[in-house]
């Protein structure tokens, strides 16, 4: 699932609340939370309140730390999945992850340069990390929840978002105007949705949700 967020719409708080709820209601799920290039105080707050493994790099760390941490978390999640565990993998954010790999010369290896100075090769690993979510035939599953920033004013950030847009099974859009009314989570109901949601719900439930959605929108 991709959580599309404008600045100050509450993405990190939403991820923290989701992780806490999963830990309470599904204690068997292994939670891995990855924060990339985040503010130090945000890292401290997340680490204090989120159960599970929190792997974080703050914005006062060097570039290689961001990319190395992301790859370590990716490998860790895959090992747990292969061991038959149910894993919740949280990434905040795909935007900063893309920036880090784009600025790390080990991964931006001379592919086609897109608008905003984004090297196409640099997004290879972020795409792999986001695409690791799956429900295997045997025991084990991996659910991915990742945030992606929009409307930051940076052309490169918009390019990164476009590369991930539509690639998840669900897109949850947060609305800053709703957050400013102190309504949380600040979800844009019209912009959010799940692919083939009718296959996940009973016919009656799906009809009820559809009717409610039409009334609210």
Model-predicted segments: where are they?
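Short, small-residue-biased leader/transition segments that mark boundaries at the very start
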Residues: 1-2
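P-loop NTPase catalytic core
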Residues: 8-12, 16-217
